[in-house]
């Protein structure tokens, strides 16, 4: 039974990842006054299948000087961690209802840094190594603000369980009382997933393709899938944290439709931002976090602690 449940979780995620690549190419195409993929299948709908067939039938190449074991294990680890992150997410029922679901997501997303670091180091290429070091520094830095924002929300929510966030937001979305945190969270998720305008690790003009420059065929596809699975996950998490979905115990289907719609809107915003903004400079990226976001999130965290105490109001308990 558990195997069936796991497959029912993994297969839709992989399908969503496949079609997200098509949606991205379509959106970028229309924003640049062209059609995007429209040859393979009706309206280009079979393009993801064609891409997958091409990538997984090509021969995976290993550079002669690379560390074979780590070179192979890094993309596998990246996708495994990206799929593991979905376990505690309520849609409307999680695969495993963890008491510390928020901490679980934070801990597992921190481990994703290792797959990037290993891939850059094992490739034995200076471009890949510089890209990996940039990505690791960026990911670790932005996790600091993500953790503090999550702490503020936990203080508001009164529980580390993600499913109680739905109960907390039955009358009002958390985006309304915590809108500065929402804006910083959304920007930090862009940086955390290495998306434009924070795609410093994949700067084509400087590093060719960043940490995955030596990867081809299947292993490259695994990295690609992990990146897009993380994008959808981060937007699903944003929906759960700030835009609590409509919840009616007698109609759980409406919760799912609502959840998917909000996630889709946020994901489209990710793609829209990619088409609209140029890449940040590396020092600007770090300045934004350490000089702007960190003091602000700490101040907001203290604000959330003090308001609860001063008004003698306790958050909803589980």
Curated annotation (Swiss-Prot):
Catalytic activity: a ubiquinone + NADH + 5 H(+)(in) = a ubiquinol + NAD(+) + 4 H(+)(out)
HAMAP family: NDH1_NuoH (MF_01350)
Record protein name field: NADH-ubiquinone oxidoreductase chain 1
A Gene Ontology molecular function term of the record: NADH dehydrogenase (ubiquinone) activity
Membrane topology: Multi-pass membrane protein
Gene: MT-ND1
Transmembrane segments: 3-23, 69-89, 100-120, 135-155, 171-191, 213-233, 253-273, 294-314
Protein location: Mitochondrion inner membrane
């Amino acid at each position: 039974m558990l195997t069936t449940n796991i497959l029912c979780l993994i297969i839709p995620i992989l399908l969503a990842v496949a079609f997200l690549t098509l949606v991205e190419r379509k959106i970028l195409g229309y924003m640049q006054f062209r059609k995007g993929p429209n040859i393979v299948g009706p309206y280009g709908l079979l393009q993801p299948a064609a891409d997958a067939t091409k990538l997984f039938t090509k021969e995976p190449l290993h550079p002669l000087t690379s560390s074979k074991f780590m070179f192979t294990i890094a993309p596998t680890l990246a996708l495994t961690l990206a799929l593991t992150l979905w376990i505690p997410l309520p849609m409307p029922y999680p695969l495993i209802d963890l008491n510390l679901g928020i901490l679980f997501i934070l801990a597992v997303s921190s481990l994703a840094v290792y797959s990037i670091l290993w891939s850059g180091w094992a490739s034995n290429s200076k471009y890949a190594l510089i890209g990996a070091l940039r990505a690791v520094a960026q990911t670790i830095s932005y996790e600091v603000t993500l953790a503090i924002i999550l702490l503020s929300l936990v203080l508001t929510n009164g529980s580390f369980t993600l499913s109680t966030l739905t109960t907390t937001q039955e009358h009002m979305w958390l985006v309304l009382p915590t809108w500065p945190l929402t804006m910083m969270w959304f920007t930090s998720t862009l940086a955390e997933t290495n998306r434009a305008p924070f795609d410093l690790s994949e700067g084509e003009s400087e590093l060719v393709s960043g940490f995955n420059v030596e990867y081809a065929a299947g292993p490259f596809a695994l990295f690609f899938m992990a990146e897009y699975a993380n994008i959808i996950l981060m937007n699903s998490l944003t929906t759960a944290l700030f835009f609590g979905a409509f919840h009616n115990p007698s109609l759980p289907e409406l919760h799912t439709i609502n959840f998917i719609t909000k996630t889709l809107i946020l994901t489209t915003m990710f793609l829209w931002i990619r088409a609209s903004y140029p890449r940040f400079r590396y020092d600007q990226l770090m300045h934004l976090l350490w000089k702007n976001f960190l003091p602000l999130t700490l101040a907001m965290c203290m604000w959330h602690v003090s308001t609860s105490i001063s008004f003698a109001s306790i958050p909803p308990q589980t």
